[in-house]
Amino acid sequence: MLKIIIPTIMLFPVIWYSNGNMIWINTTSYSLMISLMTLPLLNQTENNSNNFSLMFFSDSLSSPLLMLTVWLLPLMIMASQHHLTKEPLMRKKLYLSMLTFLQMFLIMTFTATELILFYILFEATLIPTLIIITRWGNQTERLNAGLYFLFYTLIGSLPLLVALIYVQNSLGSLNYLVMNMWSQDTSSLWSSNLLWLACIMAFMVKMPLYGLHLWLPKAHVEAPIAGSMVLAAVLLKLGGYGMLRLTMILNPTTKIMAYPFIMLCLWGMIMTSSICLRQTDLKSLIAYSSVSHMALVIVAILMQTPWSFMGATALMIAHGLTSSMLFCLANSNYERIHSRTMLLARGLQAFLPLMATWWLLASLTNLALPPFINLIGELFVIMASFSWSNLTIIMTGLNMLITALYSLYMLTMTQRGKFTYHIYNIKPSYTRENTLMSMHMLPLIMLTFNPKIIMGLTY
């Protein structure tokens, strides 16, 4: 594990010793090297667990998420170049250091064996994200967004700490590898339902569950591009990862407690998809679409069947790459037009034909077009929920329909139609941007050929 963590720590001297004209190329190439070094982790052993040490391990659930995290750092650095050009060198270095801190915390979160260590690192990811949003965001509302983000996450995860300390006292260990072999049943503890709620609530806020999702659109809209990318692609997956880890341990309570949450998610995903149809703000639309996709993941995790687990992990990885790509595209529009309103960005296909191709591909992956892994994930979840209750097919089917509607609405609003007169002198698309989009798209296409490496624990 140290072969990933130590190179990530060594990014700091690379950042601080680079001079102004080399800082981008140095950090991008170095972080790409780290992501290539992580690739062997995807090849899992027979017993499905690489126990590196007492502190860190990886299995087929954490290694795809780990890979997603390290793959995203070079992409975030590439996406941030344009809007940091006017900043002084010191601020550029600070910004890159924050991204590196975030990457380091995330790597350790996904591989921690001990639940308290996981909790500490889970909370530590909050600090760099908050600094990125409140320092480099575009509008003054970013402080409000940062406050929302901070309080929702902190208040959600305090009960988790209390519950973890209680479990530690009553059972003596919080190690994942030991907890799976528990002889004592959790339902014999004081009030297992409250314990379950306390453990799961932190991840529900992070996912976010419909009703606790109000921090997400605010944070996404106000964050700079790298903040939006890492928030959509990795930080939401932390919630899913924590839920997958804990619900397995908290059985059989999950089977009783899951009903209201499954109902809320099935209702919430239709609601948030419908909100997407009414959005004028491009980033806000993508943020709400994240909420509706993550609701499907919560449904899958709470159903506790092998198929739904496979669907949840596949959907998490697919959504990470897709939503990150959509935010990059929205940002490339914003850098040219200086507005997030879709009405002001009409008819861009005539000016940027290659960008229109990327827009089409991103919209199609977002609406789960076959053969992409988005569809594989969604189909697994829908089949699992259908066998749980036949009526869920109405909700999930309606959700797929509305998703297709707002994805195509987003595509036609930004690319087609009569262009507005203030975009005559916009810049062409740069090689950097096209490389960035292709590096989002390539993993999605490649995973289509071998989806089993992201199918998670049960495959």
UniProtKB/Swiss-Prot annotation:
Membrane association type: Multi-pass membrane protein
Q: Which GO terms describe its cellular component?
A: mitochondrial inner membrane
Instruction: Write down the chemical reaction(s) this protein catalyses.
Output: a ubiquinone + NADH + 5 H(+)(in) = a ubiquinol + NAD(+) + 4 H(+)(out)
- The EC number of this protein is 7.1.1.2
Q: Give the principal location in a single coarse category.
A: mitochondrion
Q: Which keywords, in A-to-Z order, does the entry hold?
A: Electron transport, Membrane, Mitochondrion, Mitochondrion inner membrane, NAD, Respiratory chain, Translocase, Transmembrane, Transmembrane helix, Transport, Ubiquinone
| One GO MF term attached to the UniProt entry | ubiquinone binding
TM segment ranges: 20-42, 60-80, 92-112, 113-133, 147-167, 194-214, 224-244, 256-276, 284-303, 308-330, 351-373, 391-411
Give, as one word, the top-level EC class: translocase
Pfam families, alphabetized: Oxidored_q5_N, Proton_antipo_M
Q: Any one Gene Ontology biological process term? A: mitochondrial electron transport, NADH to ubiquinone
Instruction: Kindly list the places in or outside the cell where this protein is found, as annotated in its UniProt entry.
Output: Mitochondrion inner membrane
Concerning its family, UniProt says:
Belongs to the complex I subunit 4 family.
The protein's role, per its UniProt record: Core subunit of the mitochondrial membrane respiratory chain NADH dehydrogenase (Complex I) which catalyzes electron transfer from NADH through the respiratory chain, using ubiquinone as an electron acceptor. Essential for the catalytic activity and assembly of complex I.
Q: Which PANTHER family does the record cross-reference, listed alphabetically?
A: NADH-UBIQUINONE OXIDOREDUCTASE CHAIN 4 (PTHR43507:SF20)
Q: How does it assemble?
A: Core subunit of respiratory chain NADH dehydrogenase (Complex I) which is composed of 45 different subunits.
Protein name in UniProt? NADH-ubiquinone oxidoreductase chain 4
Gene this protein is translated from? MT-ND4
